[in-house]
Amino acid sequence: MKKADIGLIGLAVMGENLALNMESKGFTVAVYNRSFPGEEGVVDRFVNGRGKGKNFIPAHSIEELVEAVKRPRVIMMMIKAGAPVDEMIEQLLPHMSPGDVIIDGGNSDFHDTERRVKEVEAKGLYFVGSGISGG
């Protein structure tokens, strides 16, 4: 099974366009979107729409996403800052291994980023707070 170079969580406007940009530069990208009522099928719509025929690996669960990425894994989140980031980290950690990297591409408060660095590094992983969007 082909493995992705990076995993991306969040297929709203910023995440979708970032995934397309990475893929256009030669990266294979595993994509996942948190599911809320009425938003089921976001991943499939993306890979069968704007991502059709491109190097995307659809993931429908955190486990699928993590398993789809080459080691050491790099998982980037493009989701709303605050509690959603903490919740996603909690879901990711049990499936990741020492040396893996979690990147927060949202607009998180730097105090939250500093706290997350300590929490994630205590598990042997790396955490990068790299705000891309002010949204």
Task: Provide a role label for each language-model segment.
Residues 5, 105, 129, 134-135:
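Glycine-centered flexibility motif
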Residues 34-37, 49-115, 119-121:
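Rossmann-like NAD(P)-binding element
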Residues 116-134:
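Rossmann-fold dehydrogenase core element
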